[in-house]
């Protein structure tokens, strides 16, 4: 996600998130663009940007503005084996990222949200069709699905049920 145009569908989906998530995870954060967008959208939230690449995380830390540095942190983590407790995050975001469905379901809190965005829609190399996202997430206790489009991008938002 190189610039704000690439964030359009992601930000549209963020606007649809009900409530004020206190803990947000941006998985596959790369240089932190989506994590910083979440921090701006939810000014009370603590945001964790996780990525396997220390080089990307170094860039994310470098570009984090001072006004967000106190509540945004970047950590090295493998999306297939996240080091966070079950139900830790009220919002989990993935921008142009391979979905690790079991781990997403595990770390998303009951009634929490998971947001997938693809900056070039179906042209994104790792794009996952909304039908597949819905099917995989329904099997893992999610409901209340919504699709978003803005520019070339697409986003998909799902809410986890209270009890799975």
Residue ranges and their predicted role:
Residues 113-136:
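Conserved class I S-adenosyl-L-methionine
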């Amino acid at each position: 996600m190189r610039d704000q145009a690439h964030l359009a569908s992601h930000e549209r989906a963020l606007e649809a998130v009900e409530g004020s998530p206190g803990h947000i995870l941006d998985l596959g954060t790369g240089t932190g663009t989506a994590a910083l967008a979440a921090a701006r959208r939810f000014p009370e939230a603590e945001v964790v940007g996780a990525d396997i690449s220390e080089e990307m995380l170094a860039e994310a830390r470098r570009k984090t503005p001072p006004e967000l540095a106190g509540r945004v942190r970047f950590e090295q983590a493998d999306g297939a084996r996240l080091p966070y407790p079950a139900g830790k995050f009220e919002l989990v975001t993935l921008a142009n990222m391979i979905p690790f469905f079991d781990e997403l379901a595990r770390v998303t809190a009951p009634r929490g949200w998971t947001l997938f965005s693809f900056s070039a829609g179906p042209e994104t190399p790792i794009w996952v069709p909304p039908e597949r996202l819905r099917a995989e997430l329904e099997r893992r206790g999610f409901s209340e699905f919504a699709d978003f489009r803005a520019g070339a991008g697409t986003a998909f938002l799902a809410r986890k049920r209270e009890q799975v």
